[in-house]
Amino acid sequence: MNRLIVVLLTSFLIFGCSSNPTPVAPVIEKFEATKYLGKWYEIVRLPHSFEEGLQRVTAEYRLNDDGTIEVTNRGYNIELGEWETAIGHAKPVGTAMYKVTFFWPFYGGYYISELQTNDAGDYSIAVITSDSYDYFWVLSRTPKVPENVLDEIMKKAESWGYDTSLMIRVNHQAGYQ
């Protein structure tokens, strides 16, 4: 029994923490990390336990001296009536490809599959995918995205194999503190 546990744990560490990225959707080829830094609003996501019940979710990215990125996710828990914050780190593994951890040694793939820019050339909307169809986010520099833009993103998500009927629209209306 102990031997089985050691084999399973070793397998998990080898395969679960692998540095080989395996995105399920295309990843953009041109990307400037410094233009991605700063605050983003979560607009759409797939459901998962670590964001359950959260609204007004934001992510803030800061560059560390070693080239990694500090990630601060913040959301308002409606049931508890309080803000929740999680701080993680992202390591670049390729162009627009990161391994993100909020609980070492467990990493998840974070791949930028689409970036839209505003008239000034700044990144304004990002579509984030992962190693599985369980994770998908639409982020924006503003709390609102035009419906026609979201419709186009959802069409792309479906073409990549995502079930868009499961996606959650994040509420950013005032009144949650």
What are these regions (language model features)?
Residues 1-4:
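Positively charged n-region of N-terminal signal peptides that target proteins for export
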Residues 6-14:
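Bacterial N-terminal signal peptides
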Residues 17-177:
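A beta-rich soluble binding module of mature secreted/lumenal proteins
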